[in-house]
Amino acid sequence: MKKIYIILLILFVILISLIGASILLVMSLSGENVDLFGGEKIAKVYLCNEIYFDYNQGDGIFPQQKKDARYYINLLDDLEKDDSVKGVLLVVNSPGGEVIASEKLARKVEELAKKKPVVVYVEGLDASGAYMVSAPADYIVAEKHSIVGSIGVRMDLMHYYGLMKKLGINVTTIKAGKYKDIGSPFRPMTKEEKEYLQKMINETYMDFVKWVAEHRHLSINYTLKIADGKIYSGEDAKKVGLVDEVGTEEDALKKLEQLANVSNPEIVEYGLEENKGLFGLTYYLGYGIGKGIGEVLYGMEKINGRVELLS
């Protein structure tokens, strides 16, 4: 009987060890560093993709959680609550993304910055919605030849009624509600419809301008002058007040350690790997702000009728 108890105890220990190893393996495959001990830490978070909400997390044979805005919001929330994390270095290389996703992530950064220091390091591209996310940080460091700004709003609506006419294709739309088919690709847009959409774009743009002005301590009038959709090099962004310093990642880390009052902290990285599933191929539809240079730099294809916080 005693031998049976010993065998059961050994099996129990082996089972617990296997469960622990499995948890560590899953966390490792998800692209996160695993910290088993306490101590002062700096979290390095890589924001290196488009900012959007992905409601299809299961594509691919071995699906993993995608690095959408919800992932970053939840991650920053965890880092905010973790007392061992003394500051956050946000490494940005993003063209922006959807309006709501960018706004919610930006508000999360704003909330985090009230609790512990946040420094942004612009590695290559910090445009439009991504800059909205960066603005509430305590300090922004950009590489000299990085691209910053592209603060503006843009909506693209594709029309192919001309092609349909040539092909002899007709579409009959039955609707209830005057604006129900606004932006339809099957007919020309009316002047009234265009004015309506322009008003919506203008309102979104002013919200963006006010956000930048507030968090970069600039006047509204001045921000309007520099927020005309123009892109700036890191050096020029420093001159107009969109970043605080032209420098390297080491400079950004040094500044964060200074703000957090820590020395030689452990650096824990998050969000570095891109997880799109084995056969993931996603076109993102929705509501966002401005397109432009980010599409060229990122090689991203977009589809009709989306307003974006993209460069």
Swiss-Prot record:
InterPro entries: ClpP/crotonase-like_dom_sf, Pept_S49_SppA, Peptidase_S49, S49_SppA_C. Its EC number is 3.4.21.-. CDD domains: S49_Sppa_N_C. GO terms for biological process: proteolysis. Gene3D superfamilies: 2-enoyl-CoA Hydratase, Chain A, domain 1, 6.20.330.10. It comes from the Archaea. This is Putative protease MJ0651.
